[in-house]
Amino acid sequence: VYPQAAVDPLDGSNSWLHKAPTAHNDVNFIEAIIDTLSNNYNIDNDRVYACGYSEGGIFSYELGCRLNNRIAAFSAISGSMLVDAFRVSYYNLGNCSPIHPTAVLLIPGSADSNPHSTYSGFQPYYMSVNEITTYWANHNNTDTNPIVTPISNTNNSDGSTVEMRIWKNGDNCVAVKELKVINGDHDWPGSFGNMDINATQEIWKFLSKYDINGLINCGLTSSIEINESEIQIFPNPTSQHLSINGINEKNLNYTIYNSKGELVINGVLNSNKFSVDISELESHIYILRIGNFSYKIIKE
């Protein structure tokens, strides 16, 4: 769902938050959208996510702060988080006040020079990335120190690389994850800027593991370990068979759901090179779930 921002009366631009003071309440607008979708479609209200780019990233933080009872997890790309003092003094919004452990994914660029998304922050208005991750790591009670992993530099011509930083073991198994684009600008990786990662795919892979209660199946013990980086799902789109490679554990359940959340196919992966016949499905978008991971597939 892509909400349309209202026109700012001062400069004619589309903005999620009109210049103060204003009678507009964008958070109430988003809540009304969620209510409307819930009343008309079979959505899972425990798995409502938010994501945004630039000012949309700032707004995603606001939803995480002010509509936390409806937002399971969220992601922000090239957008910062308002400093509480600025939020209170200028916008009269009150402090950020999340009420449940909330998984957060940030994808910032270290060379982003926009005032509202610079990596080092823009005091006293916008927090730095380090301040943001510290805030959510503290709120979620995660490990103090992140696990830092370099991402393969698969594209040498984009002028940037990616470093993954993840704070694990939060309450209800939630995590805070940063995909730092080193030398990255005000970009959406995978579409423009860095090409080592695809921001759209990274967002869904991360958020879809959580619901309003935290990590789905948190606390369940299992001997099965899935290395998501080794999973290959192709061709996608497809009209006949979908190949699933890289699952090294046998007898792992998989499920496919339609856009209404209805189960349409399920089975067991009994080989590390498995094929699923989806030829009988209607041409549409579906969700494949393997363990805690979800993937969008397109039936032609």
Question: What is the predicted function of each stretch?
Answer:
Residues E225-E300:
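C-terminal outer-membrane/trafficking sorting elements
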Residues A72-A73, S78-V148, N153-S160, W167-D171:
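The feature captures the conserved acid-bearing segment of alpha/beta-hydrolase catalytic domains
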Residues N42-D44, C51, E55, R66-N69, ...:
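Extracellular/periplasmic catalytic domains that process cell-envelope and extracellular macromolecules
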Residues G57-N68, S78:
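Short glycine-enriched nucleophile-adjacent loop
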Residues T102, A137-I224, E262:
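Alpha/beta-hydrolase-fold serine-hydrolase catalytic core, especially in secreted/extracellular enzymes
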Residues A6-L10, S54-I58, G79-V83, S110-N114, ...:
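Solvent-exposed loop/turn segments at secondary-structure junctions
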Residues V1-Y49, Y53, E62, R66, ...:
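Serine-hydrolase catalytic machinery in alpha/beta-hydrolase-like enzymes
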